[in-house]
């Protein structure tokens, strides 16, 4: 334990005075040993077997907000490491993150980001703007650059409802912390190429919430159809993708029953048309 916490048992002075708005910066000053630290990994280590890979995440903007959906599969090489992983994280009332890449590090990053936003709101008395959240996450990803260069790459997808603009927004990242706003829809992970093809074909500007969720599930189904690392609906085990919805009313996770109904609609339609719904030529 850090020396800052040893002694009389009372909180050190740093905890009793105004500090940085970033929880990560505060912890780095007061007790850096409590931050995730993998700096001493050997440079010639092979990380592939150490942590499963989280795979495909999609996001779709609709008229009242934004939908974030993720498949449940995690892989380790050619092995299915987990069939029911949760890759979506509510980060505050109006934002959420989906992770692809090194699962263990991605989950820790998402949870630390949750604390980061909570710390800022307590410290400042107001939440960060959505763009502020996007930039703060970019800084945290950048601090993972050393690990990314050793193969532990984490690529999150941030979505949120911008209360100042009254719309859903999507932000993607590269492994070195570059932040890019995406418009209408986006996908990340091993199946993202196939998911984006479906999103491009099915997206409409006037989508309602349920339709946006259905489009996201169709995109994940297409990804699973061509990418073995992406899991499709598992009807026998009743394992379905997870879907988060963020609107002016805040964040909510669609219930298992809601997603099950939508997933069964997708699967039933695929029995008739295995390649999925078609888009008009003109």
Swiss-Prot record:
<comment type="pathway">
    <text>Protein degradation; proteasomal Pup-dependent pathway.</text>
</comment>
<dbReference type="InterPro" id="IPR022483">
    <property type="entry name" value="PSB_actinobac"/>
</dbReference>
<dbReference type="GO" id="GO:0005737">
    <property type="term" value="C:cytoplasm"/>
</dbReference>
<feature type="propeptide" description="Removed in mature form; by autocatalysis">
    <location>
        <begin position="1"/>
        <end position="54"/>
    </location>
</feature>
<dbReference type="InterPro" id="IPR001353">
    <property type="entry name" value="Proteasome_sua/b"/>
</dbReference>
<comment type="function">
    <text>Component of the proteasome core, a large protease complex with broad specificity involved in protein degradation.</text>
</comment>
<keyword id="KW-0963">Cytoplasm</keyword>
<dbReference type="GO" id="GO:0004298">
    <property type="term" value="F:threonine-type endopeptidase activity"/>
</dbReference>
<dbReference type="InterPro" id="IPR023333">
    <property type="entry name" value="Proteasome_suB-type"/>
</dbReference>
<keyword id="KW-0378">Hydrolase</keyword>
<feature type="active site" description="Nucleophile">
    <location>
        <position position="55"/>
    </location>
</feature>
<dbReference type="GO" id="GO:0010498">
    <property type="term" value="P:proteasomal protein catabolic process"/>
</dbReference>
<protein>
    <recommendedName>
        <fullName>Proteasome subunit beta</fullName>
        <ecNumber>3.4.25.1</ecNumber>
    </recommendedName>
</protein>
<keyword id="KW-0647">Proteasome</keyword>
<dbReference type="Pfam" id="PF00227">
    <property type="entry name" value="Proteasome"/>
</dbReference>
<comment type="similarity">
    <text>Belongs to the peptidase T1B family.</text>
</comment>
<dbReference type="GO" id="GO:0019941">
    <property type="term" value="P:modification-dependent protein catabolic process"/>
</dbReference>
<dbReference type="GO" id="GO:0019774">
    <property type="term" value="C:proteasome core complex, beta-subunit complex"/>
</dbReference>
<dbReference type="InterPro" id="IPR029055">
    <property type="entry name" value="Ntn_hydrolases_N"/>
</dbReference>
<keyword id="KW-0888">Threonine protease</keyword>
<dbReference type="InterPro" id="IPR000243">
    <property type="entry name" value="Pept_T1A_subB"/>
</dbReference>
<comment type="subunit">
    <text>The 20S proteasome core is composed of 14 alpha and 14 beta subunits that assemble into four stacked heptameric rings, resulting in a barrel-shaped structure. The two inner rings, each composed of seven catalytic beta subunits, are sandwiched by two outer rings, each composed of seven alpha subunits. The catalytic chamber with the active sites is on the inside of the barrel. Has a gated structure, the ends of the cylinder being occluded by the N-termini of the alpha-subunits. Is capped by the proteasome-associated ATPase, ARC.</text>
</comment>
<keyword id="KW-0645">Protease</keyword>
<keyword id="KW-0865">Zymogen</keyword>
<keyword id="KW-0068">Autocatalytic cleavage</keyword>
